[in-house]
Amino acid sequence: MSSLNTDFNELMERVRAGREFGHASFEPIFYLIFDPQKILKIKRQLPAWAAKLRNEGWDVHVFSMAKAVQEVFDEMPVFVKKTWEKQDSAALENRDAAANLGLQWQKTNKSLAEALTKKNALQNKLEAKLSDLEGKSNSILLVSDIEALHPYLRIGSMESQLQGKFHVPTIFFYPGMRTGKTQLKFLGFYPEDGNYRSVHVGG
């Protein structure tokens, strides 16, 4: 955990430096990059980090991608959710037929991905949170559970679409690896994604 704590402390130094020396075009977007195998360690450590930030005078807010994804699903029409359930059941009943199983899950995941991206449903939830925090001094937003976006979408596209909306320091806890100054590999196996204008620490 010491390496994660070291990375988090370094990231917070960047956050403070950004607040002091940031210029008009700078958006306070930060990524703590960590090995996907440490997802559970991050989840256990997050409350302690949040408490530490509060002790330092920050107004801490947490946005869970997992909860946001669940909310989008819960808001879908009943008939759509029933269709997904039928697809899931069919996949489980045919688990011996690997090809059929893969096809069923592929259809289900495609439907879920469309639900998340249609009218930017998931992105709008994050944007609403960012808007709510705008103008609130000492606020900081911790975005957790980013692994919940797999296999539907990647956070890089969402960050790009929300450029200009980040008015308070926002920290994304990103399971993956760095492959360059601005390139990341989500969960360590997705293709490299360079659509980032944020500050990266760790990885």
Language model region names:
Residues 14, 118-134:
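A short, acidic, amphipathic alpha-helical segment used as a generic capping/interface helix at domain edges
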Residues 37-41, 68, 112-119, 147-151, ...:
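Short acidic, S/G/P-rich loop/turn micro-motifs used as interaction or catalytic elements
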Residues 147-203:
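Glycine-rich, aromatic-bearing surface loops/beta-hairpins
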